[in-house]
């Protein structure tokens, strides 16, 4: 089965690379928002219909790739008074934001609109951050636009401001949204499984989701699974959200609960969350093409976080009036307990099941300032990137069963800047240490760099971005069974999931050129990329680094919201001169995501030693 899957993936990669190469049939001017159908639109339509039929997704409603431009869109209206707010909600089918009054002629569309439960107007009213008479703030407008889109109950939206013809100092706000279908019976053939389930959006006309799925998995040791979740966002206009996820399969059984409020705008004063989970994990699946790693643990975790933000209006920069500076104080409690486990730690330290808890307080200086970009970490979809300087100081008490109580303190700083006509870079540094019996333990310095270039056009059909990522970590005063390590999940060579690189210091760099298509092929957006990953580790006073691993390869990323593919990544990696008994010198990696699962809000918050300005654009500032 796995060999057949690999052959299919490789064939698909070669086919899609061929499709993305500039072809003579694509000589006309290309619109990146439309499918290129070449000289045979009927044949292309047949292919598209076959794809939709094979995917069993022709009854499923999907979001559109609406491009959000951020605060820049509203800059021309800065300082003007809001005169009125007009809101209109559209049915899911037969109309669009651009043509809201088009007659619905198809019987299927009329039937679907008839059984759809429309979103109640108060859902949008609860998201509007300005009131009539307020002054337009472009940053607040951008925050509101992003918040509405992130609710994931609309397939499309558009927010515009219009100056009154008789008073140029006053504007009207127009908000148009188009609902996603409020319910779907969903069939999906995915990379890891085939699933069927029911998906409820706009449940009871409110911003609620309730999803349940049964999956047939493509592996004998995990033949079937069941998962689902419930979510209610912005309860009673409080911006507090509740989330419950549950999962049952041969590897992982359990549930998790989250209730919290994020920093949802530049004017937010407080946030926080409560998180708890309970899981029984029999094995860990690093890559679905590889064998699962046995774990056999039962654990529960809790996290409680509460920050308070104070505005610093006296700090202003003329070049960027949208930025807002904050002084933040916060407190966080983490706890992780294993109720059953085979051992505390493996000999190679690749797996550890150590009980612990911590309480930390922090103060920080943060900047609420971000911009919108497309085609960076995801295809087409709008992403947000921070700008400016953030810093924080943390201190508190940590307890781990192997070492007992220790004090912990850390300094964190980040700086990000968008260089005009060149690109974007973000630097992050953190120094932290434990203290016990007046002696420092497990001191670690972490530094990281992210850079991506501006778009460089190659003709009318292809554009290019260059990515560079680098990490350097240095540790001191480690216990005998503890050290730093690098793998796929913490900045090492992609596809190397084992802790083959361990030591007092580690370094890694990744260089990745990406080539994107400006057109779509039967609904697919795509890019191809190459990469070179180099990682090394060292200990002692001899060679600074005494072990090196290299990885080189090619990959493909595609996106097709109509087929339910939010993100598909196929990567082939080769590791020259790698002589490891437990690791092949090549790997095939597949990542696939869609909007099926409501999502794990807190993820691995319970093992974090820092407090994040959670869910805010300042996502890398530990506060």
Residue ranges and their predicted role:
Residues 7, 22, 27:
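Beta-rich carbohydrate-recognition modules and glycan-binding surfaces
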Residues 2, 26-440, 451-623:
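Immediate N-terminus of the mature polypeptide
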Residues 8-10, 395:
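Generic recognition of cysteine residues
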Residues 10-21:
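Bacterial N-terminal signal peptides
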Residues 1-7:
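N-terminal secretory signal peptides that target proteins for export/translocation
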């Amino acid at each position: 089965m796995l060999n057949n899957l690999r052959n299919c993936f490789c064939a698909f990669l070669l086919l899609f690379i061929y499709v993305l190469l500039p072809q003579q049939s694509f000589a006309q001017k290309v619109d990146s928002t439309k499918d290129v159908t070449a000289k045979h639109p009927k044949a292309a339509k047949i292919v598209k219909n076959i794809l939709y039929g094979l995917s069993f997704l022709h009854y499923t409603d999907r979001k559109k790739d609406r491009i959000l431009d951020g605060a820049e869109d509203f800059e021309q209206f800065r300082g003007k008074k809001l005169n009125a707010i007009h809101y209109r909600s559209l049915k899911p089918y037969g109309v669009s934001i651009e043509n809201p009054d088009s007659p619905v002629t198809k019987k299927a569309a009329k039937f679907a609109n008839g059984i759809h439960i429309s979103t109640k107007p108060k859902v949008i009213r609860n998201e509007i951050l300005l009131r009539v008479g307020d002054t337009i703030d472009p940053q607040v407008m951008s925050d509101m636009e992003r918040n509405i889109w992130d609710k994931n109950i609309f397939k499309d939206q558009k927010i515009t401001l219009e100056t009154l013809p008789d008073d140029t100092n006053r504007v009207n706000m127009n908000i148009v949204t188009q609902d996603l279908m409020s319910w779907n019976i969903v069939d999906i053939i995915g990379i890891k499984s085939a699933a069927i389930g029911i998906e409820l959006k706009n449940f009871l006309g409110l911003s609620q989701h309730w999803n349940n799925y049964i999956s047939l998995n493509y592996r004998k040791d995990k033949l079937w699974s069941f998962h689902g979740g419930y979510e209610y966002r912005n309860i009673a206009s409080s911006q507090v959200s509740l989330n419950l996820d549950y999962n049952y399969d041969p590897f992982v059984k359990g549930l998790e609960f989250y209730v919290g409020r994020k920093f949802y705008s530049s004017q937010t004063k407080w946030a926080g969350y409560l998180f708890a989970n309970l899981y029984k994990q029999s094995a860990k699946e690093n890559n679905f093409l590889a064998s699962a790693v046995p774990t056999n643990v039962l654990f529960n975790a809790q996290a409680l976080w509460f920050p308070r933000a104070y505005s610093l209006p006296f700090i202003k920069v003329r070049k960027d009036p949208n930025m807002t500076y904050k002084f933040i104080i916060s407190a966080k409690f983490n706890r992780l307990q294993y109720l059953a486990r085979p051992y505390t730690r493996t000999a190679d330290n690749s797996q550890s099941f150590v009980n612990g808890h911590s309480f930390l307080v922090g103060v920080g200086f943060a900047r609420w300032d971000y911009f919108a970009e497309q085609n960076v970490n995801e295809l087409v979809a709008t992403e947000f990137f921070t700008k400016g300087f953030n810093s924080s100081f943390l201190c508190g008490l940590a307890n781990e069963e192997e070492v007992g109580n220790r004090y912990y303190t850390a300094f964190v700083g980040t700086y990000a800047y968008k260089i005009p006509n060149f690109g974007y870079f973000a630097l992050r540094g953190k120094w932290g240490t434990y203290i016990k019996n007046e002696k420092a333990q497990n001191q670690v310095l972490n530094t990281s760099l992210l850079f991506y270039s501006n778009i460089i056009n190659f003709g009318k059909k292809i554009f290019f971005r260059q990515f560079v990522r680098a990490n350097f970590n240095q540790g001191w005063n480690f216990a005998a069974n503890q050290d730093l390590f690098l793998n796929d999940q913490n900045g090492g060579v992609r596809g190397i999931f084992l802790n083959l690189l361990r030591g007092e210091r580690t370094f890694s760099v990744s260089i990745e050129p990406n080539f994107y298509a400006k057109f779509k092929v039967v609904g697919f957006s795509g890019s191809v990329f190459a990469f070179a990953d180099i990682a090394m580790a060292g200990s002692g006073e001899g060679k600074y680094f005494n072990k090196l691993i290299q990885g080189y390869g090619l990959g493909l990323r595609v996106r097709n919201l109509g087929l339910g593919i939010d993100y598909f990544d196929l990567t082939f990696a080769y590791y020259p001169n790698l002589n490891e008994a437990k690791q092949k010198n090549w790997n095939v990696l597949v990542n696939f995501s869609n909007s099926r699962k409501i999502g794990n809000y807190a993820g691995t918050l319970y093992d974090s030693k820092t407090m994040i300005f959670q869910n805010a654009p300042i996502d890398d500032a530990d506060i």
